[in-house]
């Protein structure tokens, strides 16, 4: 169990997934889980680890099938969530989702050979609607692609949340153009980064996280488990993600900001 020096305030897990085996998959999905991880499974996992609140991240294998996530948000008020949407979605749909507890849109651009052009009218209209709702854009993309896409996203005025430490390019890491572009975006005041996904980033992940905390500060960082660790379920546990955070952020006061203060303001205020 986590130490009381960490969990002495409400803890927010900023990135989890839920899904069921009967949900329709997109063609050629990145992952194809053969099991369900329901909202109830998630709640039980959170409770076992003393975590109060969580944010469901829309997952690319199910594309814009958001029905189960939205229904779960309506049922469980301790959850918030992001969805995957086409940029042509109407405002009335966004309003209905907002009432359910949706607070953002995920752009799952990772492993996408042709990243969508977010400067088109459809995307600019879409991003303006998200900004008007005070939602955030939650982007998952390779670090080396951040310098090209961040300016257009920032110009829209929408809040940005970048997944998994910005996924720095492994060889250059914190010295890469992508990592520097992410830090510059954070400095401009509308961007946050998730301290998450270390198990997906190799042995350098702790170094990336420590440098991010040092450069960005805990006021712009949120912790996340990435539960249930799709594709790595046999090798990663929830407790290990907590232990990784403790190792990366040894200062208890800084950890409290990353697991409580910052995500509460960003997701639940």
Q: Each PLM stretch: what is its role?
A:
Residues 1-12, 35-53, 217-219, 234-269:
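Mid-to-C-terminal alpha-helical segments outside catalytic/metal-binding sites
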Residues 12-16, 54-57, 80-83, 103-107, ...:
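Hydrophobic faces of well-ordered beta-strands that scaffold small-molecule active sites
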Residues 15, 46, 69, 97, ...:
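Conserved, mostly hydrophobic/aromatic
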Residues 19-21, 61-64, 88-89, 112-113, ...:
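Active-site environment of divalent metal-dependent phosphoester hydrolases
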Residues 29-75, 95:
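Alpha-helical scaffold segments that flank or form the walls of functional sites
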Residues 41-45, 65-72, 93-97, 122-129, ...:
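A general structural detector for well-ordered alpha-helical segments in enzyme core domains, enriched
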Residues 63-144, 187, 192, 197-198:
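Active-site gating/metal-coordination segments in enzymes
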Residues 119-223:
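Catalytic pocket-lining loop regions of alpha/beta-barrel enzymes
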């Amino acid at each position: 169990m986590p130490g009381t020096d960490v969990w002495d305030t409400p803890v927010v897990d900023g990135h989890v997934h839920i899904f069921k085996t009967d949900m329709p998959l997109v063609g050629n999905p990145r992952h194809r889980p053969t099991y369900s991880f329901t909202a109830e499974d998630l709640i039980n996992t959170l409770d076992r680890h003393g975590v109060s609140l969580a944010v469901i991240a829309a997952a690319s294998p199910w594309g814009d099938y958001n029905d189960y996530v939205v229904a779960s948000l309506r049922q469980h008020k301790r959850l918030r969530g992001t969805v995957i949407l086409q940029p042509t979605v109407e405002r009335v749909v966004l309003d209905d989702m907002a009432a359910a507890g949706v607070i953002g849109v995920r752009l799952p651009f990772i492993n996408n050979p042709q990243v969508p052009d977010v400067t088109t009218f459809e995307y600019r209209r879409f991003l303006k609607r998200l900004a008007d709702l005070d939602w955030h854009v939650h982007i998952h993309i390779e670090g080396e692609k951040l310098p090209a896409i961040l300016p257009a996203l920032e110009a829209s005025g929408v809040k940005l949340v970048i997944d998994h430490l910005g996924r720095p390019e492994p060889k250059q890491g914190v010295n890469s153009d992508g990592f520097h572009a992410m830090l510059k975006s954070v400095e401009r005041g509308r961007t946050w980064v998730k301290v998450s996904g270390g198990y997906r980033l190799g042995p350098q992940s702790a170094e990336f996280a420590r440098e991010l905390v040092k450069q960005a500060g805990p006021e712009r960082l949120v912790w996340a488990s990435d539960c249930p660790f799709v594709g790595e379920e046999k090798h990663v546990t929830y407790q290990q993600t907590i232990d990784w955070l403790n190792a990366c952020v040894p200062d208890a006061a800084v950890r409290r900001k990353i697991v409580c203060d910052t995500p509460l303001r960003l997701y639940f205020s």
